[in-house]
């Protein structure tokens, strides 16, 4: 841990989601106090399950909550891809002992609320993190000694620096960058189904995906296998805006009429759906603006096709902490090192996720090519292809 900073001012964090609370933990571990400004009336995560690769566990260990989170996770035996049209096996990636030896950490699935709770408990246990809810960041001003944040109630908050971790619709990014989100036209429906209602022949201990033309389905166990997360994605026929709302069973069924009955039955199970119209942004080279820096979805929102959104936010948090350890109380150099260490990697994730969406949703001849390319591929070949993503650690996170 770095020496305790001389100033009694906190670092301000806009956003109390996974990235914001992870950043709070990382900063406290470097001797800072933190004030989190969250717009929602209470902290929490919208959504259901989330997949965690080895890089996520490396980040959690660096934040000091690895064991706490491991106790809440479900460890899969494999990742499995089937063709949703004919049920054929496209590819299988074992995530057992050989996978763990290769990447020094497991592959797991966990409820978003459980990972957020682990982070929040870790932050609260430090006694150095203050959380203000119902606080909407409106404007940021800077001077040579720090930042002043103005919220929608007219209250000002003073800090050494500001971390903008306020999501896809980031107010901090809007002030400093001013770009628009790129609405993908892809819609995601998410639901949780109790084990007793889930088809027995699909109760696999795996992160399973069924890929189809302009659509795919994902399912995996949660919370000790007592629940199953069901996620379906399709290309919308309508003009979409980035949004989250209640889903329509009739709508989601209408997009999966051509897939095989075995996969389609999954869509008929949930009683309640949450609907996301997804968006990302074009990668940018500048995340740092004086004493303000972007993090997580505010910096690099990504589509879900690599299951890396939350993982990247936690990597950001750890890297930010490490940069401040190297350049203690030197904001210019610390923030520059943080930015230099993260921009290319996260841009690769954003662009790779777009391409993976195309592969998942291939149709016609492209579908045949996809299936042929992955057919019979050995675990080692898959692992080699994943090394750039899953090989990240707190020890190798800095660019120099």
Language model regions located:
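C-terminal auxiliary extensions adjacent to catalytic cores
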Residues: 375-400
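Short helix-loop capping/hinge motifs at secondary-structure junctions, enriched
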Residues: 67, 195-202, 239, 262, ...
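A short coil-to-beta-strand element that immediately follows conserved catalytic motifs
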Residues: 183-186, 202-206, 227, 261-277
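Active-site substrate-recognition segment that forms the wall
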Residues: 205-240, 249, 253-257, 278
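Residues at the starts of beta-strands that form the adenosine-phosphate
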Residues: 10, 33, 227
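Acidic/histidine metal-binding catalytic segments
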Residues: 71-74, 130, 257-272, 331-336
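Conserved mid-domain beta->alpha element of the FAD-binding
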Residues: 13-41, 163-164, 189, 219, ...
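Conserved N-terminal helical subregion
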Residues: 2-11, 28, 53-175, 179-194, ...
């Amino acid at each position: 841990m770095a020496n305790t900073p001389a100033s009694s001012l906190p670092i301000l964090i806009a956003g109390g989601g996974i990235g914001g609370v992870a950043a709070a933990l990382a900063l406290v571990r470097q001797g800072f106090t933190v004030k989190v400004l969250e717009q929602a009336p209470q902290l929490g995560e919208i959504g259901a399950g989330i997949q965690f690769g080895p890089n996520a566990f490396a980040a959690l260990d660096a934040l000091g909550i690895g064991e706490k989170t491991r106790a809440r996770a479900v460890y899969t035996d494999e990742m499995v891809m089937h063709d949703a049209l004919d049920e054929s096996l496209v590819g299988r990636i074992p995530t057992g002992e050989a996978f763990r030896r290769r990447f020094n950490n497991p592959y797991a699935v966990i409820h978003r609320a459980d990972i957020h709770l682990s982070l929040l408990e870790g932050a609260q246990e430090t006694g150095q993190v203050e959380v203000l809810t119902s606080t909407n960041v409106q404007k940021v001003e800077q001077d040579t000694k720090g930042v002043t944040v103005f919220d929608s109630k007219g209250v000002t908050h003073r800090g050494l620096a500001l971390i903008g971790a306020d999501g896809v619709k980031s107010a901090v990014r809007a002030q400093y960058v001013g770009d628009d989100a790129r609405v993908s036209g892809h819609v995601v429906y998410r639901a949780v189904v109790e084990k007793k209602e889930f088809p027995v022949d699909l109760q696999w201990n795996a992160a399973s995906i069924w890929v189809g033309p302009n659509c795919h389905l994902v399912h995996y166990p949660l919370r000790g296998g007592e629940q199953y997360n069901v996620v379906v994605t399709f290309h919308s026929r309508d003009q979409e805006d980035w949004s989250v709302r209640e889903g329509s069973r009739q709508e989601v069924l209408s997009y999966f009429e051509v897939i095989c009955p075995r996969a389609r039955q999954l869509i008929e199970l949930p009683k309640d759906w949450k609907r996301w119209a997804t968006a990302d942004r074009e990668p940018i080279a500048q995340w740092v603006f004086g004493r303000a820096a972007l993090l997580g979805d505010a910096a690099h929102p990504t589509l879900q096709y690599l299951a890396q959104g939350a993982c990247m936010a936690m990597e950001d948090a750890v890297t930010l902490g490490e940069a401040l350890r190297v350049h203690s109380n030197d904001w210019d150099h610390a923030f520059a090192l943080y930015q230099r260490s993260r921009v290319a990697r996260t841009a690769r994730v954003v662009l790779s996720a777009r391409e993976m969406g195309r592969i998942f949703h291939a149709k016609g001849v492209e579908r045949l090519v996809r299936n042929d390319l992955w057919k019979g591929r050995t675990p080692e070949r898959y692992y080699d292809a994943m090394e750039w993503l899953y090989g990240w650690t707190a020890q190798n996170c800095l660019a120099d």
